[in-house]
Amino acid sequence: MRNSAAHPVPAAPALTEVRLGDQMLRVPSAAGEPVRPVDRLLAGAVTLAPDARVLVLGGGAGALAVMLARRVSQGKLLLMDAEATDLDLAEQTLRANGIGNATVSRDITLAAGQAVSFDAAVMALPKGRKLARRWLLEAAAALRPDGMLFLAGPNNEGIQPVIGDAGALFGPVTPLGYRERCRIARARKGDMPIPPPWAAEPGVAPGTWRRFSAGVRGVTLELESLPGVFAYDRLDDGTRLLLEHLEIPPGARVLDIGCGYGLIGLWAARSGAAQVDLTDSSLLAAAAARRNLDAHGVHQAQVFTGDALAPVAGRSYDLIVTNPPFHEGRAVTSAAAHRFIQQARAALLPGGRFVLVANRFLPYDQVLRPLFGTVTRLADDRRYHVISSEC
Protein backbone atom coordinates (compact mmCIF):
# COMPACT_ATOMS: atom_id res chain seq x y z
CA MET A 1 0.00 0.00 0.00
CA ARG A 2 1.31 3.46 -0.87
CA ASN A 3 1.50 6.09 1.82
CA SER A 4 -1.20 8.75 1.70
CA ALA A 5 -0.34 12.21 0.51
CA ALA A 6 1.04 14.77 2.93
CA HIS A 7 -1.59 16.62 4.94
CA PRO A 8 -2.50 19.71 2.89
CA VAL A 9 -2.02 23.21 4.30
CA PRO A 10 -5.54 24.63 4.65
CA ALA A 11 -6.52 28.02 3.27
CA ALA A 12 -7.05 30.81 5.78
CA PRO A 13 -10.54 30.21 7.21
CA ALA A 14 -13.33 32.67 7.90
CA LEU A 15 -13.34 33.33 11.64
CA THR A 16 -15.98 33.94 14.30
CA GLU A 17 -15.44 35.46 17.75
CA VAL A 18 -16.70 33.38 20.69
CA ARG A 19 -16.42 33.61 24.46
CA LEU A 20 -14.97 30.89 26.67
CA GLY A 21 -14.93 31.84 30.33
CA ASP A 22 -13.54 35.35 30.61
CA GLN A 23 -11.75 35.24 27.27
CA MET A 24 -12.70 36.06 23.69
CA LEU A 25 -11.35 33.66 21.06
CA ARG A 26 -11.44 33.39 17.29
CA VAL A 27 -12.54 30.08 15.81
CA PRO A 28 -13.25 28.95 12.23
CA SER A 29 -16.78 29.79 11.17
CA ALA A 30 -17.04 26.25 9.79
CA ALA A 31 -16.95 24.78 13.29
CA GLY A 32 -20.42 23.40 13.98
CA GLU A 33 -20.03 23.77 17.76
CA PRO A 34 -17.06 26.07 18.37
CA VAL A 35 -17.45 25.96 22.16
CA ARG A 36 -18.94 22.81 23.67
CA PRO A 37 -20.54 22.56 27.13
CA VAL A 38 -17.58 20.39 28.21
CA ASP A 39 -15.21 23.16 27.11
CA ARG A 40 -16.96 25.62 29.41
CA LEU A 41 -16.96 23.12 32.27
CA LEU A 42 -13.28 22.28 31.90
CA ALA A 43 -12.26 25.90 31.38
CA GLY A 44 -13.80 26.78 34.74
CA ALA A 45 -12.32 23.88 36.69
CA VAL A 46 -8.84 23.11 35.34
CA THR A 47 -6.05 24.71 37.39
CA LEU A 48 -2.54 24.78 35.94
CA ALA A 49 0.86 26.22 36.81
CA PRO A 50 2.23 28.65 34.20
CA ASP A 51 5.02 26.21 33.28
CA ALA A 52 2.85 23.08 33.17
CA ARG A 53 2.98 20.49 30.40
CA VAL A 54 -0.58 19.60 29.40
CA LEU A 55 -2.03 16.76 27.33
CA VAL A 56 -5.48 17.45 25.84
CA LEU A 57 -7.46 14.45 24.58
CA GLY A 58 -10.52 15.36 22.51
CA GLY A 59 -10.15 19.09 22.03
CA GLY A 60 -13.00 19.70 19.59
CA ALA A 61 -12.55 22.82 17.46
CA GLY A 62 -9.64 24.02 19.61
CA ALA A 63 -11.20 26.73 21.80
CA LEU A 64 -10.34 24.85 25.00
CA ALA A 65 -6.77 24.29 23.81
CA VAL A 66 -6.35 28.03 23.20
CA MET A 67 -7.52 28.90 26.70
CA LEU A 68 -5.33 26.24 28.35
CA ALA A 69 -2.29 27.19 26.25
CA ARG A 70 -2.69 30.80 27.40
CA ARG A 71 -2.74 29.62 31.01
CA VAL A 72 0.52 27.69 30.57
CA SER A 73 2.34 30.54 28.86
CA GLN A 74 5.71 29.15 30.00
CA GLY A 75 4.72 25.52 29.43
CA LYS A 76 3.63 23.28 26.57
CA LEU A 77 0.37 21.76 25.37
CA LEU A 78 -0.11 18.66 23.20
CA LEU A 79 -3.50 18.13 21.56
CA MET A 80 -4.71 14.72 20.35
CA ASP A 81 -8.06 13.62 18.95
CA ALA A 82 -9.61 10.71 17.08
CA GLU A 83 -11.06 12.93 14.34
CA ALA A 84 -8.87 14.49 11.66
CA THR A 85 -11.54 17.08 10.89
CA ASP A 86 -11.53 18.27 14.51
CA LEU A 87 -7.74 18.54 14.44
CA ASP A 88 -7.94 20.57 11.22
CA LEU A 89 -10.24 23.04 12.98
CA ALA A 90 -8.07 23.05 16.11
CA GLU A 91 -4.95 23.87 14.09
CA GLN A 92 -6.77 26.78 12.46
CA THR A 93 -8.03 27.98 15.85
CA LEU A 94 -4.57 27.86 17.42
CA ARG A 95 -3.09 29.82 14.50
CA ALA A 96 -5.90 32.36 14.52
CA ASN A 97 -5.24 33.11 18.19
CA GLY A 98 -1.46 33.31 17.88
CA ILE A 99 -0.77 30.27 20.07
CA GLY A 100 2.85 29.17 19.79
CA ASN A 101 3.19 26.75 22.71
CA ALA A 102 0.73 24.11 21.49
CA THR A 103 1.33 21.14 19.19
CA VAL A 104 -1.31 19.10 17.35
CA SER A 105 -0.56 15.38 17.04
CA ARG A 106 -2.18 13.14 14.43
CA ASP A 107 -0.77 9.98 16.00
CA ILE A 108 -3.26 7.52 17.47
CA THR A 109 -1.09 6.84 20.53
CA LEU A 110 1.56 8.71 22.47
CA ALA A 111 5.17 8.24 21.48
CA ALA A 112 7.34 6.31 23.95
CA GLY A 113 9.35 9.44 24.72
CA GLN A 114 6.22 11.25 25.92
CA ALA A 115 5.53 8.86 28.82
CA VAL A 116 5.57 10.27 32.37
CA SER A 117 6.16 13.79 31.06
CA PHE A 118 2.88 15.68 31.56
CA ASP A 119 1.69 17.56 34.62
CA ALA A 120 -1.97 17.41 33.63
CA ALA A 121 -4.21 15.52 31.22
CA VAL A 122 -7.49 17.15 30.17
CA MET A 123 -9.93 14.71 28.57
CA ALA A 124 -13.29 15.35 26.92
CA LEU A 125 -15.38 12.20 26.67
CA PRO A 126 -15.04 10.55 23.22
CA LYS A 127 -17.66 8.43 21.50
CA GLY A 128 -17.69 4.97 23.02
CA ARG A 129 -16.64 3.68 26.42
CA LYS A 130 -13.84 1.50 25.11
CA LEU A 131 -12.19 4.41 23.32
CA ALA A 132 -12.59 6.41 26.55
CA ARG A 133 -10.82 3.62 28.43
CA ARG A 134 -8.01 3.67 25.89
CA TRP A 135 -7.63 7.41 26.42
CA LEU A 136 -7.63 6.95 30.20
CA LEU A 137 -4.75 4.50 29.80
CA GLU A 138 -2.94 6.98 27.55
CA ALA A 139 -3.40 9.67 30.18
CA ALA A 140 -2.17 7.42 32.98
CA ALA A 141 0.98 6.59 31.02
CA ALA A 142 1.56 10.22 30.08
CA LEU A 143 1.23 11.74 33.54
CA ARG A 144 4.16 12.19 35.89
CA PRO A 145 3.72 11.06 39.53
CA ASP A 146 1.14 13.33 41.21
CA GLY A 147 -0.03 14.56 37.79
CA MET A 148 -3.73 15.40 37.51
CA LEU A 149 -6.44 14.06 35.21
CA PHE A 150 -9.45 16.28 34.46
CA LEU A 151 -12.31 14.41 32.79
CA ALA A 152 -15.63 15.81 31.55
CA GLY A 153 -18.51 14.76 29.34
CA PRO A 154 -22.29 14.75 28.84
CA ASN A 155 -24.46 12.65 31.12
CA ASN A 156 -26.41 11.15 28.23
CA GLU A 157 -23.22 10.01 26.48
CA GLY A 158 -21.92 7.94 29.38
CA ILE A 159 -19.65 10.17 31.46
CA GLN A 160 -20.62 8.58 34.79
CA PRO A 161 -19.44 5.04 33.92
CA VAL A 162 -16.22 6.49 32.48
CA ILE A 163 -15.62 8.45 35.69
CA GLY A 164 -16.00 5.08 37.40
CA ASP A 165 -13.40 3.64 35.03
CA ALA A 166 -11.06 6.51 35.93
CA GLY A 167 -11.49 5.56 39.58
CA ALA A 168 -10.70 1.92 38.85
CA LEU A 169 -7.49 2.98 37.09
CA PHE A 170 -6.29 5.95 39.19
CA GLY A 171 -7.90 5.45 42.57
CA PRO A 172 -10.17 7.99 44.29
CA VAL A 173 -11.89 10.46 41.96
CA THR A 174 -13.10 13.90 43.06
CA PRO A 175 -16.32 15.25 41.47
CA LEU A 176 -15.84 18.90 40.52
CA GLY A 177 -19.21 19.95 39.22
CA TYR A 178 -22.25 19.51 37.02
CA ARG A 179 -23.46 22.04 34.45
CA GLU A 180 -25.31 22.01 31.13
CA ARG A 181 -25.99 18.28 31.62
CA CYS A 182 -22.26 17.55 31.80
CA ARG A 183 -20.11 16.27 34.66
CA ILE A 184 -16.48 16.88 35.50
CA ALA A 185 -14.17 14.98 37.82
CA ARG A 186 -10.51 14.98 38.81
CA ALA A 187 -8.09 12.17 39.65
CA ARG A 188 -4.47 12.20 40.80
CA LYS A 189 -1.77 9.78 39.64
CA GLY A 190 -0.60 8.54 43.00
CA ASP A 191 -0.24 4.95 44.16
CA MET A 192 -2.16 3.30 41.34
CA PRO A 193 -4.45 0.35 42.19
CA ILE A 194 -4.09 -3.01 40.49
CA PRO A 195 -5.16 -2.31 36.87
CA PRO A 196 -8.72 -3.39 36.07
CA PRO A 197 -9.09 -6.33 33.65
CA TRP A 198 -10.14 -4.05 30.78
CA ALA A 199 -6.73 -2.35 30.87
CA ALA A 200 -5.27 -5.35 29.04
CA GLU A 201 -8.09 -5.76 26.51
CA PRO A 202 -6.83 -5.88 22.89
CA GLY A 203 -7.57 -2.57 21.20
CA VAL A 204 -8.13 -0.83 24.53
CA ALA A 205 -4.56 -1.17 25.78
CA PRO A 206 -2.49 1.41 23.84
CA GLY A 207 -0.34 -0.19 21.18
CA THR A 208 -2.67 -3.18 20.78
CA TRP A 209 -5.28 -4.06 18.15
CA ARG A 210 -8.54 -6.00 18.17
CA ARG A 211 -8.22 -8.98 15.82
CA PHE A 212 -11.19 -10.75 14.24
CA SER A 213 -12.21 -12.72 11.15
CA ALA A 214 -14.70 -11.68 8.48
CA GLY A 215 -16.23 -14.12 6.01
CA VAL A 216 -17.29 -12.75 2.60
CA ARG A 217 -18.43 -14.94 -0.32
CA GLY A 218 -16.67 -17.96 1.11
CA VAL A 219 -13.44 -16.07 1.78
CA THR A 220 -12.23 -15.54 5.35
CA LEU A 221 -10.19 -12.40 5.95
CA GLU A 222 -8.19 -11.72 9.10
CA LEU A 223 -8.60 -8.08 10.15
CA GLU A 224 -7.59 -5.67 12.91
CA SER A 225 -9.28 -2.56 14.22
CA LEU A 226 -9.66 -0.25 17.22
CA PRO A 227 -12.44 1.04 19.47
CA GLY A 228 -13.82 4.25 18.03
CA VAL A 229 -14.14 2.71 14.55
CA PHE A 230 -17.63 1.68 13.42
CA ALA A 231 -18.28 -2.03 14.15
CA TYR A 232 -14.63 -2.27 15.17
CA ASP A 233 -14.72 -5.93 16.21
CA ARG A 234 -16.87 -7.55 13.53
CA LEU A 235 -18.21 -7.44 9.98
CA ASP A 236 -21.46 -5.49 10.25
CA ASP A 237 -24.54 -6.80 8.44
CA GLY A 238 -24.86 -3.81 6.12
CA THR A 239 -21.33 -4.12 4.78
CA ARG A 240 -21.78 -7.88 4.44
CA LEU A 241 -24.88 -7.39 2.27
CA LEU A 242 -23.06 -4.78 0.19
CA LEU A 243 -20.03 -7.00 -0.46
CA GLU A 244 -22.21 -9.98 -1.36
CA HIS A 245 -23.66 -7.96 -4.27
CA LEU A 246 -20.76 -5.68 -5.23
CA GLU A 247 -19.11 -6.32 -8.59
CA ILE A 248 -15.72 -4.72 -9.25
CA PRO A 249 -14.96 -4.03 -12.94
CA PRO A 250 -11.45 -5.29 -13.81
CA GLY A 251 -8.96 -2.43 -13.82
CA ALA A 252 -11.41 -0.01 -12.20
CA ARG A 253 -10.48 3.06 -10.22
CA VAL A 254 -12.42 2.69 -6.96
CA LEU A 255 -13.13 5.00 -4.02
CA ASP A 256 -14.38 3.84 -0.60
CA ILE A 257 -15.84 6.82 1.32
CA GLY A 258 -15.97 6.51 5.11
CA CYS A 259 -13.82 3.41 4.88
CA GLY A 260 -13.74 2.36 8.53
CA TYR A 261 -11.16 -0.39 8.98
CA GLY A 262 -10.90 -0.73 5.20
CA LEU A 263 -12.75 -3.92 4.31
CA ILE A 264 -14.60 -2.55 1.26
CA GLY A 265 -11.41 -1.09 -0.21
CA LEU A 266 -9.52 -4.29 0.59
CA TRP A 267 -12.20 -6.37 -1.14
CA ALA A 268 -12.11 -4.11 -4.21
CA ALA A 269 -8.32 -4.42 -4.44
CA ARG A 270 -8.51 -8.22 -4.13
CA SER A 271 -11.24 -8.30 -6.79
CA GLY A 272 -9.26 -6.70 -9.60
CA ALA A 273 -9.39 -2.94 -9.10
CA ALA A 274 -6.36 -1.16 -10.55
CA GLN A 275 -6.42 1.63 -7.97
CA VAL A 276 -8.34 2.00 -4.71
CA ASP A 277 -8.57 5.16 -2.62
CA LEU A 278 -10.06 5.08 0.87
CA THR A 279 -11.12 8.09 2.94
CA ASP A 280 -12.27 8.53 6.52
CA SER A 281 -12.36 11.44 8.96
CA SER A 282 -11.28 9.12 11.78
CA LEU A 283 -7.54 8.74 12.39
CA LEU A 284 -8.27 5.43 14.11
CA ALA A 285 -10.15 4.13 11.06
CA ALA A 286 -7.45 5.28 8.67
CA ALA A 287 -4.75 3.61 10.78
CA ALA A 288 -6.73 0.36 10.86
CA ALA A 289 -7.38 0.48 7.10
CA ARG A 290 -3.68 0.97 6.36
CA ARG A 291 -2.79 -1.88 8.68
CA ASN A 292 -5.26 -4.27 7.04
CA LEU A 293 -4.20 -3.35 3.51
CA ASP A 294 -0.55 -3.85 4.42
CA ALA A 295 -1.27 -7.17 6.14
CA HIS A 296 -2.94 -8.47 2.97
CA GLY A 297 -0.17 -7.28 0.67
CA VAL A 298 -2.27 -4.67 -1.14
CA HIS A 299 -0.07 -2.18 -2.98
CA GLN A 300 -2.56 -0.40 -5.27
CA ALA A 301 -4.42 1.35 -2.44
CA GLN A 302 -4.05 4.68 -0.68
CA VAL A 303 -5.73 5.82 2.55
CA PHE A 304 -6.57 9.49 3.19
CA THR A 305 -7.88 11.24 6.29
CA GLY A 306 -10.49 13.95 5.93
CA ASP A 307 -14.16 14.61 5.35
CA ALA A 308 -15.88 12.72 2.52
CA LEU A 309 -14.13 13.41 -0.82
CA ALA A 310 -12.18 16.47 0.33
CA PRO A 311 -8.87 14.56 0.63
CA VAL A 312 -9.17 13.27 -2.97
CA ALA A 313 -10.46 16.44 -4.61
CA GLY A 314 -9.72 16.45 -8.34
CA ARG A 315 -9.60 12.66 -8.72
CA SER A 316 -12.13 10.70 -10.78
CA TYR A 317 -13.41 7.15 -10.38
CA ASP A 318 -15.21 4.34 -12.18
CA LEU A 319 -16.82 3.11 -8.95
CA ILE A 320 -17.51 4.84 -5.64
CA VAL A 321 -18.76 2.76 -2.72
CA THR A 322 -19.89 3.69 0.78
CA ASN A 323 -21.60 2.50 3.93
CA PRO A 324 -22.30 6.02 5.23
CA PRO A 325 -22.80 6.92 8.89
CA PHE A 326 -26.33 7.83 9.89
CA HIS A 327 -25.75 8.97 13.47
CA GLU A 328 -24.32 12.22 14.76
CA GLY A 329 -23.99 11.75 18.49
CA ARG A 330 -27.31 10.21 19.53
CA ALA A 331 -29.33 11.73 16.67
CA VAL A 332 -30.25 9.94 13.45
CA THR A 333 -29.19 12.09 10.50
CA SER A 334 -28.61 11.58 6.79
CA ALA A 335 -26.45 14.70 6.43
CA ALA A 336 -23.20 12.80 5.89
CA ALA A 337 -24.77 10.49 3.31
CA HIS A 338 -26.26 13.44 1.40
CA ARG A 339 -22.81 15.05 1.34
CA PHE A 340 -21.23 11.80 0.13
CA ILE A 341 -23.83 11.48 -2.64
CA GLN A 342 -23.44 15.04 -3.92
CA GLN A 343 -19.65 14.84 -3.96
CA ALA A 344 -19.58 11.33 -5.43
CA ARG A 345 -21.67 12.36 -8.44
CA ALA A 346 -19.13 15.05 -9.32
CA ALA A 347 -16.20 12.61 -9.01
CA LEU A 348 -17.57 9.80 -11.19
CA LEU A 349 -16.29 9.23 -14.71
CA PRO A 350 -18.84 8.90 -17.54
CA GLY A 351 -20.56 5.55 -17.12
CA GLY A 352 -19.36 5.31 -13.52
CA ARG A 353 -21.37 3.83 -10.65
CA PHE A 354 -22.11 4.88 -7.09
CA VAL A 355 -23.11 2.06 -4.72
CA LEU A 356 -24.23 2.51 -1.14
CA VAL A 357 -25.76 0.42 1.60
CA ALA A 358 -28.09 1.95 4.15
CA ASN A 359 -30.88 1.17 6.57
CA ARG A 360 -34.13 0.58 4.73
CA PHE A 361 -35.88 3.41 6.58
CA LEU A 362 -33.49 5.95 5.03
CA PRO A 363 -34.97 6.90 1.60
CA TYR A 364 -31.77 7.71 -0.27
CA ASP A 365 -33.45 6.78 -3.56
CA GLN A 366 -35.15 10.19 -3.46
CA VAL A 367 -31.78 11.95 -3.20
CA LEU A 368 -30.12 9.81 -5.87
CA ARG A 369 -32.75 9.98 -8.64
CA PRO A 370 -32.36 13.70 -9.47
CA LEU A 371 -28.58 13.26 -9.77
CA PHE A 372 -28.16 9.96 -11.60
CA GLY A 373 -29.58 8.55 -14.79
CA THR A 374 -30.30 5.09 -13.39
CA VAL A 375 -31.01 4.06 -9.79
CA THR A 376 -31.35 0.33 -9.05
CA ARG A 377 -31.88 -1.60 -5.84
CA LEU A 378 -29.34 -4.43 -5.96
CA ALA A 379 -30.38 -6.20 -2.77
CA ASP A 380 -32.28 -5.81 0.46
CA ASP A 381 -33.11 -7.67 3.62
CA ARG A 382 -35.14 -6.86 6.72
CA ARG A 383 -32.79 -4.03 7.77
CA TYR A 384 -30.70 -2.84 4.82
CA HIS A 385 -30.84 -2.11 1.11
CA VAL A 386 -28.03 -1.80 -1.43
CA ILE A 387 -28.58 0.87 -4.08
CA SER A 388 -26.60 1.30 -7.30
CA SER A 389 -26.70 4.55 -9.29
CA GLU A 390 -25.14 5.08 -12.72
CA CYS A 391 -24.22 8.26 -14.57
Where are these regions (language model features)?
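SAM-dependent Rossmann-like transferase core, predominantly class I methyltransferases
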Residues: 10, 16-49, 180-251
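Class I S-adenosylmethionine-dependent transferase superfamily signal
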Residues: 68, 139-140, 166, 268, ...
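Conserved SAM-binding loop
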Residues: 79, 151, 278, 356, ...
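Conserved proline-anchored active-site loop of SAM-dependent methyltransferases
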Residues: 119-130, 257-264, 317-330
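A short glycine-rich, Lys/Arg-flanked "PGG" loop and its adjoining helix->strand segment in the class I
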Residues: 133-145, 338-350
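Conserved beta-strand signature within the Rossmann-like core of class I S-adenosyl-L-methionine
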Residues: 146-154, 351-358
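Class I S-adenosyl-L-methionine
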Residues: 171-210, 359-391
